[in-house]
C-alpha cells in the first residue's frame, strides 16, 4: 500500500505554513503520491483552493484541520492555563464530516476563542460523526501527558477520544522529525496501542515542501513573532525535517511499522468529500401577506409598474413580463424579494440608499420594486447584462448605503434571517513585493535605511512582482549583484511574495444562506465581525447568495447636506433635483469634482475637464470608458471630444473608438 500525507500545513496556516497551495499537490504528484490532506492550524481558509489544485493534478484531496482543543472547556479562560490549547487532527470522511468540521472550526472562533480558536471534548462528542481523528504532534494532549511522565493519563485520554469518535475513527499518530522527545513519545504511543488495540498511523508534520524551504518557514515564524534570525531565543523548529517527504523517506523512518504507513492509504480511501460548484443554495423569502413568493413578486412588479408608468409607452409592459418570466425560470424570485425588502426597510428608517449601480440598474422589474431609482427604459439599458437566460450566473445587485448606517441594514438582515444564516466575507492581505522586502529586511536585522533603499527600487504599481522589478530596474539588479546580503534579502522575499499574511473583512460582501452558514462554509471572527473563511469568489462558486452592502461616504455627505438645506427649506428633496442642471455640468467641466462619486480621482477629473459633459449620457460614457479594460483604446476619444454633445460621445464616437 502507498503512503499518504495526512498532516500538512499550507500557507493558510498564516505565518507558519510555507507550503504554497499551488505547489502542494504538484509536489505530491512529483513524489508519486495519489492523495494528500490539508490540515491547517485551527482554520479552513485554503480548503477550496487546495481541493481545486489537487483535482487539477489528479491527486485525491482530503479535507481536514488541526484543531485546538481547550485544556478544560471553551468556557474556561484563565491566563496561563486555558490559553495553552492542545492539537488534534480531524479529517473529513464524508459530507457529514465536512459539515461537522466546518461547525467545529466555526465554533472555535465564535464561542471558544481565547488566544486561539478552541473546541472542547463536549463539542467533539456532539459533532464527531463523519470525522477521523489523529492524536497530532507533540502539542497533542496524549504526547503532552507522555512527556510529563503521565502514561496512565495519556492512555485514558486516548481511550476517551476513541470513545468520542468511534472504532476505526481514532488513530495514535507517530512522527519522527529527529527530535529525541518525539522518539520517547512514540514509545509511549506504541505501548498504548499494544495495550488497547488502538490503530497507529505515521505522519510527517509538513510545514514546507522541501528541506531547503525550512529557511522560508523560519522567516515566517520570525515575522509572526516579531523576532530576528539572529535571536537565539526565537521560536523555531528544532530540525529541518518538517517537509513533504517521499514514501521511501517515511518507510525509512518507520521500518518496523509498515501497518502505520499503510493506514495512511486506508484512511485516504475512506475520505470522500466532493464539493459541488455553481449549484445555487438561495434562502427563501416569506411574503408578509402569506402568499407564495412568485405571487408576491408579480404583485410587487405590477403595483410598481402602475406607479412608475401611469401612462406606459408601448413595449414597456412587454419588457416587464419578459423580465418576470426570466427571473422566475432562473429561480431568482426570492433574490429580488430579499433585496427589495432590506432596501425598503432602510428607506423607512431614513437610511440613505443609492439609486442603483451596476448591471442591476438595467432591470425594469427592479425599478418597479424600488430596488433601483433609475428608469432603465429612459436610458435604453439592457436587462441581459444583469440576467441572461442563455448564460446562467448569479445576479448581483450593488446596493449602496450611508457609510455610517450600513451596519444597521446588516443587523436587520441578521434579525430577519437569523444570525447563523448571515455572515460577512473574509479577505486576505498578502505579502506584496515591497511588503515582503520590508518584512524580510526586519527579520534579517538589516537597517531601516538598507531595507528602504531596496524597497524604493520596486515600482509602486498594482500587481508588481519582484521578478518584474528586477527586470525593469537596473538599480535593483546592481544592488542584488553587488551585495550578498541584498541578494539574500531579495531571494528570501521572492520565496514569500504573494503568501497570505493576515485577514480582513470585505468592504461590501454579505452572505445569506438557507441553512446555517457553517453548513456550507466555516466561519471566523475578525474583531467583532463574523466572516466566512472562504473569499468572495469561492462563495459565489459554491452557489451561495452574496450581496453587496457598500457603505458610501458620498451618500453620507449628500444626506448631511440635505439635512442642512432643510433647516432653511423644509421641503427640499434630493430626488426632485433635475438631471440636466446646466450649472452642475459646468462645474464638472471645470474640474470641480471633489466629493462626486466615481469622478473624484485626478485622472477622471482631467477627463471631465477635457470632455465638458453636458448630460447624464456624457457622464455614462466617461465612467464606462475610464476603466482598466476599455481605457487604453478609448484614451484618444476622451482627449479629442472636448465640447461634443451627448449624441456624438455616447453613440457615434463610441462606435468609432471600438477596436
Predicted regions and their residues:
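Alpha-helical scaffold/interaction cores of sigma-54-like transcription cofactors
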Residues: 1-659
Amino acid at each position: 500500500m502507498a503512503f499518504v500525507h495526512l498532516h500538512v500545513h499550507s500557507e493558510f496556516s498564516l505565518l507558519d505554513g510555507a507550503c504554497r497551495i499551488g505547489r502542494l499537490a504538484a509536489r505530491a504528484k512529483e513524489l508519486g503520491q495519489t492523495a494528500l490532506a490539508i490540515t491547517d492550524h485551527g482554520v479552513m481558509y485554503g480548503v477550496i483552493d487546495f481541493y481545486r489544485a489537487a483535482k487539477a493534478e489528479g491527486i485525491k484531496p482530503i479535507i481536514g484541520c488541526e484543531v485546538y482543543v481547550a485544556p478544560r472547556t471553551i468556557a474556561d479562560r484563565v491566563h496561563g492555563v486555558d490559553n495553552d490549547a492542545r492539537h488534534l487532527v480531524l479529517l473529513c470522511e464524508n459530507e457529514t464530516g465536512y459539515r461537522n468540521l466546518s461547525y467545529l472550526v466555526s465554533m472555535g472562533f465564535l464561542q471558544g476563542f481565547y488566544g486561539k480558536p478552541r473546541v472542547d471534548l463536549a463539542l467533539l462528542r456532539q459533532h464527531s460523526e463523519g470525522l477521523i481523528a489523529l492524536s497530532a504532534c507533540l502539542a497533542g494532549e496524549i504526547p503532552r501527558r507522555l512527556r510529563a511522565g503521565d502514561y496512565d493519563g495519556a492512555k485514558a485520554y486516548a481511550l476517551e477520544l476513541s470513545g468520542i469518535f468511534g472504532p476505526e475513527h481514532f488513530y495514535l499518530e507517530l512522527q519522527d522529525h529527529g527530535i529525541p522527545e518525539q522518539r520517547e513519545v512514540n514509545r509511549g504511543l506504541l505501548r498504548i496501542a499494544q495495550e488497547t488495540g488502538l490503530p497507529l498511523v505515521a505522519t510527517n508534520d509538513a510545514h514546507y515542501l522541501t528541506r531547503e524551504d525550512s529557511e522560508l518557514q523560519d522567516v515566517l515564524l520570525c515575522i509572526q513573532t516579531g523576532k530576528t534570525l539572529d535571536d537565539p531565543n526565537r521560536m523555531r523548529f528544532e530540525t529541518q525535517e518538517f517537509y513533504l517527504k517521499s514514501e521511501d523517506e517515511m518507510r525509512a523512518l518507520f521500518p518496523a511499522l509498515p501497518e502505520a504507513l499503510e493506514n495512511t492509504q486506508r484512511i485516504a480511501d475512506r475520505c470522500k468529500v466532493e464539493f459541488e460548484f455553481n449549484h445555487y443554495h438561495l434562502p427563501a423569502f416569506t411574503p408578509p401577506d402569506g402568499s407564495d413568493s412568485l405571487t408576491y413578486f408579480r404583485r410587487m412588479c405590477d403595483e410598481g409598474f402602475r406607479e412608475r408608468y401611469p401612462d406606459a409607452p408601448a413595449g414597456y409592459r412587454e419588457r416587464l413580463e419578459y423580465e418576470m418570466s426570466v427571473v422566475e425560470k432562473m429561480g431568482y424570485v426570492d433574490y429580488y424579494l430579499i433585496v427589495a425588502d432590506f432596501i425598503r426597510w432602510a428607506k423607512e428608517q431614513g437610511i440613505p440608499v443609492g439609486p442603483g449601480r451596476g448591471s442591476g440598474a438595467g432591470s425594469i422589474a427592479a425599478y418597479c420594486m424600488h430596488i433601483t431609482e433609475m428608469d432603465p427604459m429612459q436610458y435604453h439599458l439592457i436587462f441581459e447584462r444583469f440576467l441572461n437566460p442563455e448564460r446562467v450566473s448569479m445576479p448581483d445587485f450593488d446596493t449602496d448605503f450611508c457609510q455610517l448606517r450600513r451596519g444597521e441594514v446588516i443587523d436587520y438582515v441578521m434579525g430577519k434571517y437569523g444570525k447563523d444564516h448571515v455572515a460577512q466575507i473574509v479577505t486576505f492581505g498578502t505579502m506584496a513585493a515591497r511588503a515582503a522586502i520590508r518584512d524580510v529586511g526586519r527579520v534579517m536585522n538589516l537597517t531601516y535605511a538598507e531595507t528602504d533603499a531596496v524597497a524604493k527600487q520596486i515600482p509602486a504599481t498594482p500587481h508588481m512582482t519582484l521578478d518584474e522589478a528586477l527586470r525593469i530596474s537596473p538599480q535593483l539588479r546592481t544592488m542584488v549583484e553587488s551585495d550578498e546580503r541584498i541578494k539574500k534579502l531579495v531571494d528570501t522575499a521572492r520565496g514569500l511574495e504573494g503568501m497570505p499574511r493576515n485577514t480582513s473583512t470585505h468592504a461590501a460582501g454579505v452572505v445569506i444562506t438557507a441553512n446555517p452558514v457553517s453548513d456550507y462554509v466555516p466561519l471566523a471572527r475578525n474583531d467583532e465581525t463574523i466572516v466566512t473563511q472562504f473569499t468572495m469568489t469561492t462563495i459565489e462558486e459554491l452557489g451561495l447568495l452574496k450581496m453587496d452592502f457598500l457603505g458610501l461616504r458620498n451618500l453620507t455627505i449628500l444626506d448631511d447636506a440635505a439635512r442642512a438645506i432643510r433647516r432653511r427649506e423644509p421641503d427640499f428633496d434630493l430626488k426632485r433635483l433635475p438631471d440636466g442642471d446646466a450649472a452642475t455640468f459646468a462645474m464638472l467641466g471645470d474640474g470641480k469634482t471633489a466629493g462626486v462619486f466615481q469622478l473624484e480621482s485626478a485622472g477622471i477629473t482631467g477627463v471631465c475637464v477635457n470632455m465638458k459633459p453636458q448630460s447624464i449620457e456624457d457622464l455614462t460614457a466617461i465612467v464606462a470608458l475610464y476603466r482598466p479594460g476599455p481605457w487604453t483604446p478609448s484614451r484618444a476619444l476622451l482627449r479629442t471630444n472636448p465640447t461634443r454633445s451627448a449624441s456624438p460621445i455616447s453613440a457615434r464616437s463610441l462606435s468609432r473608438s471600438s477596436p
